[in-house]
Amino acid sequence: MTTFSFDAQVTSAHFDRSGAVFALGDGSVRFEDGVFDAVHEGAVLCATVHPSGEGLVTGGDDGRVIWSRKGEAGVLATVQGPGTGGWIDAIAASPQTKLIAFSSGKTLSVIDATDAGFRRDFQHERTVSGVAFDPGGRRIATSTYGGACLWFARIADQKPTKLVWAGSHTGVTFSPDGAFVVTTMQDMQLHGWRLKDSKNMRMGGYPSKIRAMAFLSKGSLLATSGAQGAVLWPFTGSNGPMGREASEIGFDDTTTVTLVAASNPHGRLAAGLGDGRVWVADPAGQGLNVVKAEKGAPIVALALSPDTTRVAWADEDGRAGVADVVID
């Protein structure tokens, strides 16, 4: 295990092709081997791995989108025009199409990592809270108040497909087969839509806000935080979780799962807890591998490597770590 102590809170943890990378609230990007870039004037608010797999693309409260590699950083885009908030709220990238999508206020923007001249800006009626690419990287889902919107990433003049459900939607993801869109909601539940007929799926019963969700096991399971264990929703078959109950793994009535991380199609799941512990498990197996047993401040950043052999985490006091995963 390798540990770190940062002077700022960690916004998010990731794995690029070189190892673990942390994005921090002081505007810096820190690589596992100690290399760091001070890139933003202010906090990093969101981050994702660059479509090439090298380094991070970060969005800051300075309104800039920056690609950070070891010892090198460059501005890819800035917020533009009316409807923006002056800072970057959410970001996503597609390795398949090399596109990067980010939101600022009511505006969704799309740029191409291989073409500096390409940009699309799409306007919403309300603030965009989350952004996700479909598996092929050709459509983008955004979460906002009142539901989700679907956009074609490269078409300039279009109207979105609206997926409507009352309430504040705070994050969004596609299922790995592209058949479903799922959002997290402010009122402690998930909502989903089957895209072929826009059929609604209500997925509730959570005791706290859901901050993370991740598909695993070839897309057959959706794991979420927000309960005393990691909640697992079944996504097998054409109906997904409709008419079916969720299960739970790692239940502990003394704490709450604050974050989950996975790397589809693998079956391993990582969970960060409100008491500072971190575990990794295979839902098809037995028991938990507690990779960080020491209790402390709540876990606020968590990532599992693409091959699920390593896990990275950070707590709200700036303490972070990277460890190998061993599951019997």
Language model regions located:
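WD40-repeat beta-propeller superdomains and closely related acidic/aromatic-rich repeat-like regions
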Residues: 1-328
